[in-house]
């Protein structure tokens, strides 16, 4: 078992930064030791947003984006090493999720695409990288997502308490940790993605800090109901989605039937959409005693309050209360998945993704052995 220090790197669908986490991991323990949030340059963020919404690129432009993201991830790792005064030889491996630019697990040729050249990360950090975590699961008939429920189960499952873990990133996803039942999990729909897209277009702000703008508005019930009629919400699990589906174009199509709405009312309605679609899935699954929230949305007081109101009898809290920072959960999960890969252990849960079997995930990009001085 490759016990030791691992680094997890995550750039999610919210594109609010690169999360980098340092953890000590073995078969009995995952202990977070440090973390860092590394900024994504505005121009690079926009390039990723454009490709996620279907903008065509030349092969040269696509290759450049792949390289630039790899360099960005390497810089983020090196930033953490410098912050903690560590050397490459102190780290067993990096688990890098990459940047998802397209996710299409259905259709004649199911696929998912995460970019950010792992070779650049190895070359610039001198540390072995484990990446490309999702495509093996898709090759086995799965959704390739979500992968984090396995980590949630390992750290947060309880023998008697009915728990669910909710990650609200760009997309929201649930992990259902119910005693005596197989772990299940799936994407419920948009998390922060549509709220962030709307305030960016209307106010040139990256996100609605403390939901201040949404709290000034009122929910437009006809608009909310129209959005809730989207077939994704009624589709059975396993299911997963992303920015290629729930994007600004999706929102614009719904707004065409409602001209003249106040912008703040649209924001309030999008916050309600996130809360309602999550709570409906919690209730459809039989409910839970405790809903533990992580991701950027855990800091949205309006969404958190609405979840509590829509789920009476459920304690709505954050994973911070269990000692795991909600901001670092996903990066920590991919550090753990890298450890599982190097240990030859399966990283997916077929009960979650729908894959035909559990499997070791990812590809290993080995670093050169340290040079010895003669």
Swiss-Prot record:
Catalytic activity: 1,6-anhydro-N-acetyl-beta-muramate + ATP + H2O = N-acetyl-D-muramate 6-phosphate + ADP + H(+)
Residues annotated as binding ATP: 12-19
Gene3D superfamilies, per database record: 3.30.420.40
Keywords for the protein's UniProt record, in alphabetical order: ATP-binding, Carbohydrate metabolism, Kinase, Nucleotide-binding, Transferase
GO molecular function (one): phosphotransferase activity, alcohol group as acceptor
Catalytic class of the enzyme: transferase
Record carries keyword Ion transport: no
EC number per UniProt: 2.7.1.170
One Gene Ontology biological process: peptidoglycan turnover
Keyword NADP: no
The family this protein is said to belong to: Belongs to the anhydro-N-acetylmuramic acid kinase family.
Stated role: Catalyzes the specific phosphorylation of 1,6-anhydro-N-acetylmuramic acid (anhMurNAc) with the simultaneous cleavage of the 1,6-anhydro ring, generating MurNAc-6-P. Is required for the utilization of anhMurNAc either imported from the medium or derived from its own cell wall murein, and thus plays a role in cell wall recycling.
Stored Pfam families: AnmK
InterPro entries associated with the record: Anhydro_N_Ac-Mur_kinase (IPR005338), ATPase_NBD (IPR043129)
Pathway: Amino-sugar metabolism; 1,6-anhydro-N-acetylmuramate degradation; Cell wall biogenesis; peptidoglycan recycling
Protein name: Anhydro-N-acetylmuramic acid kinase
Originating species: Escherichia fergusonii (strain ATCC 35469 / DSM 13698 / CCUG 18766 / IAM 14443 / JCM 21226 / LMG 7866 / NBRC 102419 / NCTC 12128 / CDC 0568-73)
């Amino acid at each position: 078992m490759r016990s030791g220090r691992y680094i997890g790197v995550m750039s999610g669908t919210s594109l609010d930064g690169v999360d980098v986490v340092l953890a000590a991991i073995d078969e009995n323990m995952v202990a977070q030791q440090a973390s860092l949030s590394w900024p994504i340059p505005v121009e690079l963020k926009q390039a990723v947003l454009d490709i996620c919404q279907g903008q065509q690129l030349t092969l040269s432009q696509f290759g450049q984006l792949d390289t630039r993201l790899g360099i960005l991830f390497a810089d983020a790792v090196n930033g953490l090493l410098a912050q903690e005064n560590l050397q490459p030889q102190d780290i067993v491996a990096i688990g890098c999720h990459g940047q998802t630019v397209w996710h299409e697990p259905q259709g004649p040729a199911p696929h998912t695409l995460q970019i950010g050249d792992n070779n650049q990360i190895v070359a610039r950090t001198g540390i072995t990288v484990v990446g490309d975590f999702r495509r093996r699961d898709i090759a086995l008939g799965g959704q390739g997502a979500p992968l984090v429920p396995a980590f949630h189960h390992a750290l947060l499952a309880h023998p008697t308490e009915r728990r669910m873990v909710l990650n609200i990133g760009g997309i929201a996803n649930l992990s259902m940790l119910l005693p005596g039942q197989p772990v299940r999990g799936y994407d419920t729909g948009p998390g922060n993605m549509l709220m962030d897209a709307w305030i960016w277009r209307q106010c040139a702000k990256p996100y609605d800090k403390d939901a201040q703008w949404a709290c000034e508005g009122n929910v437009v019930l006809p608009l909310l109901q129209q959005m809730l009629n989207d077939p994704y919400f009624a589709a059975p699990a396993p299911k997963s989605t992303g920015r290629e589906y729930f994007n600004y174009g999706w929102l614009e199509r719904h707004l065409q039937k409602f001209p003249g709405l106040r912008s703040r009312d649209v924001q309030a309605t999008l916050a309600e959409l996130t809360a309602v679609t999550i709570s409906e899935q919690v209730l459809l699954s039989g409910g839970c005693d405790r809903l533990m929230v992580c991701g950027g949305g855990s800091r949205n007081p309006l969404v958190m309050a609405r979840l509590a109101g829509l789920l009476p009898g459920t304690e709505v809290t954050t994973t911070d209360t269990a000692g795991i920072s909600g901001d670092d959960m996903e990066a920590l999960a991919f550090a753990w998945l890298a450890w599982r890969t190097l240990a030859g252990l399966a990283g997916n849960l077929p009960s979650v993704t729908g894959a035909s079997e559990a499997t070791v995930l990812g590809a290993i990009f080995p670093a050169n052995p340290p040079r010895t001085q003669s």
